[in-house]
């Protein structure tokens, strides 16, 4: 059965998106990403080195023809900053599918939703396909979609915390109301967290720190790949209805 993740008319067979930061070196980055099976990788614009061809860059290790680069605006604190960064990325790198991150403060890195919404409106109006990092607030998620977002990326917990999904109910509401893909972003710490997100009906999961900072990143990347697949299959299969009584696996007929 074909079950592709579709974002802005692009089809991907993997529902796992991975980040490229926090690894020990580029070699480890490549090995982990290959093990994850991901086709989309998020990159901070400073890591793709779009202005200095002499300096070592991620593109030297991860072929942009093989992977879809999803440039993000990490550590932007205003809509204007984010828009300027992505305009430069499109001009030099040709990237049109982008991830918008506009932080409100530096300790917990929660998104500034007012500035995020502003950035989405501007970028969508300029022809970008925008995937915004956002709070798990159903109302704001709907407004982002109505403003032109091609996918919604609510956090599970603060970026890099590994705390897992803190508000599963809100995620389910966001999934139910959305007509664009919902991709859980930030806070996924374990493969079981990824399974929970996918079983809840989310369309994908973005993971970076829990792979990069695992004791064995390549093994964790493989685990996350299988977790996302298992959760998706479980969601499509449809879980049994829970009940408040026991039900034996075999009946008692024919027992002497």
Curated annotation (Swiss-Prot):
Record protein name field:
Thiazole synthase
Where is the protein localized?
Answer: Cytoplasm
The UniProt keywords, alphabetically, are: Cytoplasm, Schiff base, Thiamine biosynthesis, Transferase
Keyword Chaperone assigned = no
Main localization of the protein described in the UniProt heading: cytoplasm
Q: Which Gene Ontology terms describe the biological processes this protein takes part in?
A: thiamine diphosphate biosynthetic process
Tell me which PANTHER family the record gives: THIAZOLE SYNTHASE
Which gene carries the instructions for this protein?
A: thiG
Q: Which EC numbers does the record give?
A: 2.8.1.10
**List of catalytic residues:** 99 (schiff-base intermediate with dxp)
| Xref: Pfam families | ThiG
Supply one GO molecular-function term: thiazole synthase activity
The answer to whether keyword Hydrolase applies is no
Catalysed reaction(s) here are: [ThiS sulfur-carrier protein]-C-terminal-Gly-aminoethanethioate + 2-iminoacetate + 1-deoxy-D-xylulose 5-phosphate = [ThiS sulfur-carrier protein]-C-terminal Gly-Gly + 2-[(2R,5Z)-2-carboxy-4-methylthiazol-5(2H)-ylidene]ethyl phosphate + 2 H2O + H(+)
The record's section on InterPro entries has: Aldolase_TIM (IPR013785), Thiazole_synthase_ThiG (IPR033983), ThiG (IPR008867)
Source organism, top-level taxon? Bacteria
Pathway membership of this protein? Cofactor biosynthesis; thiamine diphosphate biosynthesis
Q: Subunit structure of this entry?
A: Homotetramer. Forms heterodimers with either ThiH or ThiS.
């Amino acid at each position: 059965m074909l079950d592709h993740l579709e974002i802005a008319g692009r089809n991907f067979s993997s529902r796992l998106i991975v980040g490229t930061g926090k690894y020990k070196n580029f070699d480890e980055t490549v090995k982990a990403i290959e093990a994850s099976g991901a086709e989309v990788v998020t990159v901070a614009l400073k890591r793709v080195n779009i202005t200095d061809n002499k300096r070592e860059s991620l593109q030297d290790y991860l072929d942009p023809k093989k992977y879809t680069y999803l440039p993000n605006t990490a550590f932007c604190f205003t809509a204007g900053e984010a828009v300027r960064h992505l305009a430069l990325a499109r001009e030099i790198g040709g990237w049109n599918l982008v991830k918008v991150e506009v932080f409100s403060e530096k300790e917990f890195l929660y998104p500034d939703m007012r500035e995020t919404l502003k950035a989405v409106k501007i970028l969508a109006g300029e022809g970008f396909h925008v995937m915004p990092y956002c709070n798990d607030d159903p109302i704001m998620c709907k407004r982002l979609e109505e403003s032109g977002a091609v996918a919604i990326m609510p956090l599970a917990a603060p970026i890099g915390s590994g705390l897992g999904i803190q508000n599963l109910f809100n995620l389910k509401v966001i999934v139910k109301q959305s007509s664009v893909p919902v991709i859980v972003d930030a806070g996924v710490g374990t493969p079981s967290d990824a399974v929970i997100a996918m079983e809840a009906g989310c369309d994908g999961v973005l993971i970076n720190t829990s792979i990069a900072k695992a004791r064995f990143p390549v093994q964790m990347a493989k685990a996350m790949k299988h977790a996302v697949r298992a959760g998706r299959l479980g969601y499509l299969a449809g879980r049994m209805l829970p009940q408040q009584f026991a039900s034996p696996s075999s009946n008692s007929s024919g027992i002497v």
